[in-house]
Design a protein with these regions (language model features):
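Short amphipathic alpha-helical interaction segments
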Residues: 48-57
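Intrinsically disordered, low-complexity, charge-dense segments enriched in Lys/Arg
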Residues: 101, 105-166
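Glycine-centered, phosphate/nucleic-acid-interacting loop/turn motifs that mediate DNA/RNA or nucleotide
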Residues: 62
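DNA-recognition alpha helix
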Residues: 27-45, 59
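Short, amphipathic alpha-helical interaction segments positioned at domain boundaries
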Residues: 83-102
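Single conserved hydrophobic/aromatic residue that forms the stacking wall/gate
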Residues: 1-10, 14
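Short helix-start
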Residues: 67-82
Length: 166
C-alpha cells in the first residue's frame, strides 16, 4: 500500500546522520570505519554501501586524506559520510567539486553545512515545498544544494521502489 510505503520511507530518511560532535574523536581502523558507515546509514542505504576498496580508492584519488597510521579520524568519517550520500546521484568529479566547495573553511564547517542542507531539504520535502532556492544565492551554492537534493531524491526513490516490491 503506497501511503504505508511513503510513511516508512519518511522514517528511513537520513535525518539520523550524526552531528560533528557525535562522530568518534579517536582513530578508527578500516573495519571499524566500515561498520560505522553501515550502522550510520542503515536502513537509508543498503548494507555494504561502503567497502574497504572504495575507501582506499577515495584516498588514492584524493577525495579524502591518507589515514594517520592506518587510523581514520573525525574528518575522514565526515568526508566518507558526505561521499556516501552524494555518490547516489553524482559522479566522483562532481563530488570532488562539491566537497572542495563545502570544506573550503575546513571539514568540520563543511560537514555542518552539509547536514544543514540535508536537514532543510528533508524538512521542506515533508512540507511539500522545497525552499532551497528562494533566497538570492550564487551558482556555487545552488550547485551544492542541487547536488545534495539530487542524491537524497535518488535514495528516497530507490527506497520507495523497494517498499512497493515488498
Amino acid at each position: 500500500d503506497l501511503p504505508k510505503a511513503i510513511r516508512r520511507q519518511r522514517q528511513m530518511c537520513i535525518r539520523d546522520r550524526p552531528q560533528w560532535e557525535l562522530l568518534p574523536d579517536i582513530g578508527l581502523y578500516m573495519d571499524q570505519v566500515i561498520t560505522l558507515m553501515d550502522r550510520t546509514f542503515s536502513p537509508a542505504l543498503p548494507k555494504g554501501e561502503m567497502t574497504k576498496s572504495m575507501v582506499n580508492n577515495y584516498v588514492k584519488v584524493g577525495l579524502i586524506p591518507r589515514p594517520a597510521g592506518k587510523k581514520y579520524d573525525r574528518e575522514h568519517l565526515a568526508m566518507l559520510l558526505m561521499i556516501c550520500v552524494l555518490k547516489q546521484a553524482l559522479s566522483m568529479e562532481s563530488i570532488s567539486q562539491i566537497l572542495l566547495a563545502l570544506c573550503e573553511e575546513g571539514v568540520q564547517a563543511g560537514y555542518g553545512r552539509f547536514c544543514a542542507i540535508t536537514r532543510k531539504i528533508e524538512e521542506s520535502a515533508r512540507g511539500g515545498h522545497i525552499e532551497l532556492f528562494d533566497e538570492q544565492i550564487d551558482a556555487q551554492e545552488m550547485a551544492l544544494r542541487s547536488g545534495v537534493m539530487a542524491a537524497l531524491c535518488t535514495i528516497h526513490t530507490c527506497r520507495l521502489l523497494e517498499s512497493c516490491r515488498a
